[in-house]
Structures are given as structure tokens and as C-alpha cells.
């Protein structure tokens, strides 16, 4: 058993309370490798932003759970080395799909876990979530639950269509499970293809897809039912067109990739939404940088020469999200 406190991590409880009160959101960036982690820590340390390091089940299998624990410990020390005296870093399991997986992460030093039982019938979702909460809270680990289903594909999480969270269920769900935060479905979705072309309109000037707006009416209803309760948005990458264009110009094929407009995420950040998940954007930044190097320098085979620019591009992206979208800069001095 490894306590996250020994590693220097924090849970989300105080972080979320401040974010809800302050009208900003905490960035939750998924990572799979060292370059992504370096970029996240550099951006967070420079902006003094609290940050959530997210690891999916697939990423945990890819990176190895033991290595992840030491990467998280290294991230805390690296942040201090960069001049961030009191780093506020969470290590969070994204989309845990079983009690066993969540328990294993708690035991390995994660400071926060998500149990995603949203695909189960309502009462089964409550029962499984409550079981995870009871175990995690013994070790002061915070728990995110999900109510409603997001469409799209992210690692091993897939759903054909979304089902909006039903506001009339949230009080009962939060009370009976004891969860610390709630991921809701209001129209975001996983992956770089968040909407089908038939769900969108097209910009007459550029021909690019314009996604439908998020269901802010559902969000506001949930806020009324659970005032001050931490709300989470998954699938909130914006799919920057410049990265899509670079990828496509350098041998890639991402037609009609479309994400959540940043102005809608800014609006969400000012509400009870205190955690916004971003994964696909960093994948796109990394892939765009790597493809460009390979296209410009086809003889290059030193990984540092293409992963270095990828890391720099991701750092730039993370800083932009922190400062210009979520407003979390300066909130962890």
C-alpha cells in the first residue's frame, strides 16, 4: 500500500472547492509517456496552475502501474525543481470500469479515482460507485462518478450515442453514493470526431464543420439541484484546426475532425464545472509536431529530435488551455 501523501500528491477536495467558488476550472490532462508528463508539469509550474494528471486504464497498461507511481513522484519533484514551491498535483484514474481497478489504483498511490458505471442500470451504477467511494475514502482518496453517457471513443471506452444526464436524478445519486464530483453528459464526446457531419452545420466560407452548442440548460438545472457540487466535463478537447491541418499536410488523414469550441468551455469554467478533461488535443499537438519533423527531415531517426518538438508543442497547448480557456493560472502559488 502506497499513500499518495508520501509521494507529495494531493486529492481534489480543496482544489475543487476553490475552483467552484472562484469561477474557474482545473485542467485534467491525460498522459501516457514522459514527454507528455514533462510538458504538463512545465506548463503547470510556469503558470502556477493546479493540475490533474489523468491516466486511463489503457494508459496504465501501456506505462505500467509501478512506473506510473514513480513518474508521479518524479513529477512532484520536477515541479519543485522548476520553482513551484507547493505544487498541487493530482494523480487520477480516468474511466475506471471496476471496483478492482479503482482499488488497485488507490493502493498504488493515486490520489483520485473515477468509477465510470454510467453504462449500467441506475441502481447498479449507485451500488458500484458507493462501493468504490467507501474504499477510497478510507485512504482520503477522492472519487469521481458519472451519470449520463458520452458518445465517442477514448482508449477502451466507447459508446455509439450520448444520453444527457437527467437533472432529476443527481441529488439522489450524489447523496446515496457519497461521490466527491460528478461527470455529466451535456453534449461533449470523446475523440477527435466529436460530432458526425449530420449533427453539424458547415461554415460557408471555410467549409469546416460547426458543432452544435452544449446543453447549458441541462448544466444549469443540475447546478440548481446541487449548488456548489463539483461538476466534471469529459471529452472537452477543441480539436485545434491548425493541428489537423499540419497533420493532413504531412501525410495524415483526419477529414472532418471537430471538437468543442473554446468559448463554450470558457463559459462552462465559470459555472460549477471545476474539472475539464483534455486528451485528444495533446495527441493532435504531438502527432502534428512529429509528422512535420518526419516530413521536413525524412532522414531523422533520433527520437529526441522529433519527441522534443512534440513536447514543446504540447507545453504551448497546455499553457494556452490553462491561461486562456480554464482560467486556473495563478491559483496554486
Regions inferred by a protein language model and the residue ranges of each:
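Short catalytic-loop micro-motif centered on adjacent basic/acidic residues
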Residues: 26-30, 91-92, 114, 231-233, ...
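Alpha/beta enzyme core
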Residues: 10-21, 34-59, 65-86, 95-230, ...
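Generic N-terminal amphipathic, Lys/Arg-enriched alpha-helix
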Residues: 1-27, 300-301
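Extended, intrinsically disordered, low-complexity segments
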Residues: 289-333
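Shared catalytic-loop signature of beta/alpha-barrel
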Residues: 53, 60-64, 265, 274-292, ...
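A short N-terminal beta->alpha junction/helix N-cap motif
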Residues: 3, 24-32, 59, 309
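Short catalytic/ligand-gating loop segments at beta-alpha or beta-beta junctions
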Residues: 233-239
